Amino acid sequence: MHEMSIAISIIDAVAAKAEAEHADTVTIVELEVGKVAGVEVESLKFCFSAAAKNTVAEGAELAVCEVEPVGECEACGQRFPVAFHVATCTSCGSFKTNIVSGRELLIKSITIE
């Protein structure tokens, strides 16, 4: 369950920001998580809640925005939705594609008091 290590890293970053801002409480942590990032969102929420105990983030809401995967074709430059980790271009059929979004795991914002 790598979600626990991710949750702990999020708590560490959030606590550092709260300390830098002289805040006592974190109320909301907003994340962007790509749908092909390999993160189980519900597990992450559970782990976040457990990892936040006895920290400035205890009781904070973890708001997750899931990012749809988008591919880009190296051959024609077309961008297209991706259903799997490997995708063919929907325009020219090329296999030379890259996933350009959908792998994110970002702290988008932190609400502190």
UniProtKB/Swiss-Prot annotation:
PROSITE patterns (alphabetical): HYPA
Q: Which residues bind Ni(2+)?
A: 2
What's one GO MF term for it?
zinc ion binding
Provide the residue positions that the database annotates as binding Zn(2+): 73, 76, 89, 92
The superkingdom listed in its UniProt entry is Bacteria
A single GO BP annotation from the record? Answer: protein modification process
Instruction: Print the keywords alphabetically.
Output: Metal-binding, Nickel, Zinc
Q: Pfam families from the entry?
A: HypA (PF01155)
Family label? Belongs to the HypA/HybF family.
* Biological role: Involved in the maturation of [NiFe] hydrogenases. Required for nickel insertion into the metal center of the hydrogenase.
Protein name according to UniProt: Hydrogenase maturation factor HypA
Q: Which organism is it from?
A: Chlorobium phaeobacteroides (strain BS1)
Corresponding gene? hypA
